[in-house]
Amino acid sequence: MAMSDPIADMLTRIRNAQLAEKASVSMPSSKVKVAIAAVLKDEGYVEDFAVRQADGKANLEIALKYYAGRPVIERIERISKPGLRIYKGCDDIPRVMNGLGVAIVSTPKGVMTDRKARASKVGGEVLCIVA
């Protein structure tokens, strides 16, 4: 059976791996997942990521980050879901924890953080929040 929400699956895998104190987590790859991983790396929430080919299928491997033995990501949640998409204009994109966290937004200019979307004056689909 096909997966109904691959992005939620990705976020859940990251959350579960960090709770289990794993060094890395692997999942099926897609362009959107790679873009989300790139934003997480740029914002300092993960160490690194790489796309690896295994048996003709691309897998995304994310190296998780810890500080003083605790996961750097305290909270990671899906906002826009397949059954209820959430689109926001550039002025309405939510600030996560008053700017301490980030909202990851899919815009016509690509996947980016809420701050970059506001600076670029572009809105889009609010994929998830990370704090």
Swiss-Prot record:
Keywords: Ribonucleoprotein, Ribosomal protein, RNA-binding, rRNA-binding. The keyword Membrane does not apply. InterPro entries: Ribosomal_uS8, Ribosomal_uS8_CS, Ribosomal_uS8_sf. GO terms for biological process: translation. It comes from the Bacteria. GO terms for molecular function: rRNA binding; structural constituent of ribosome. The keyword Amino-acid biosynthesis does not apply. Part of the 30S ribosomal subunit. Contacts proteins S5 and S12. One of the primary rRNA binding proteins, it binds directly to 16S rRNA central domain where it helps coordinate assembly of the platform of the 30S subunit. Belongs to the universal ribosomal protein uS8 family. This is Small ribosomal subunit protein uS8. It comes from Dechloromonas aromatica (strain RCB).
